[in-house]
Regions:
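Active-site core segments that coordinate phosphate-bearing ligands/cofactors
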Residues: 1-215
């Protein structure tokens, strides 16, 4: 059971043996990009968010907390609502798009910190999948903020892959998990190149934005 406000969930059951996992629920991730596209019409397609983010040198002091339906783990504040702060006359739509992508890294940082505290395990590499993992800017920024390697698999839908692996083990196609692990293939690797001072400054800005949402 988590002491840092994460969920305890059943990861899988194999041969009657249940393996549990820690789960961190983030309510809004890729949906923040969809909102910028459809709600504010800042760009025409989700992939354009990456080009916009890369068109500016930094976030310009802009932060987005995408708490459109409340804050999930590790805060659990359902009444919280979204925030875009740090806007100035110099702010462009590119800064807002970048802030939305950067928010995914900060939310992940909050969860990874809680998981490391709960488990006592040092996490040096994380693997990500889904739509946002196709965004190289987000993956690179995630690696920078976490100060960890980020791997993107060739099979981009890990949930479906995991279900297929369990089925394959169950019918004998794979001998066991060790056999299944040999079938996993990495498509991309992202490694941090951000300085400690820059990381600390950015993370402090996120913490201040979270405080605004929670106040």
């Amino acid at each position: 059971v988590s002491k840092n406000r994460l969920l305890t969930t059943c990861a899988y059951c194999l041969n009657g043996n249940i393996t549990y996992a820690l789960e961190g629920s983030v309510f809004i991730a890729g949906a923040a990009i969809q909102w910028l596209r459809d709600g504010l019409q800042l760009f025409g397609s989700a992939p354009e968010s990456e080009a916009l983010a890369l068109s500016v040198k930094d976030n310009g002091g802009v932060y987005m907390v995408p708490a459109f339906t409340g804050l999930g783990a590790p805060y659990w504040e359902p009444e919280a609502r979204g925030l875009i702060c740090g806007l100035g006359r110099e702010t462009e739509k590119a800064h807002i798009a970048r802030a939305a992508l950067e928010a995914q890294a900060y939310q992940t940082l909050d969860l990874i910190g809680a998981m490391c505290d709960d488990s006592g395990i040092a996490i040096d590499t994380i693997r990500i999948d889904g739509g946002l993992s196709r965004n190289d800017f987000m993956c690179s920024f995630l690696s920078d903020i976490l100060n960890r390697d980020v791997e993107v698999p060739k099979v981009n839908e890990a949930t479906a892959w995991g279900a297929a692996v369990l089925a394959a083990i169950g019918i004998g196609v794979f001998e066991d998990f060790e056999d299944a692990k040999t079938r996993w293939q990495r498509q991309k690797l992202f490694q941090s190149s951000m300085t400690v001072s820059e990381r600390d400054k950015l993370c402090q800005g996120w913490k201040e934005a979270i405080l605004k949402v929670r106040s």
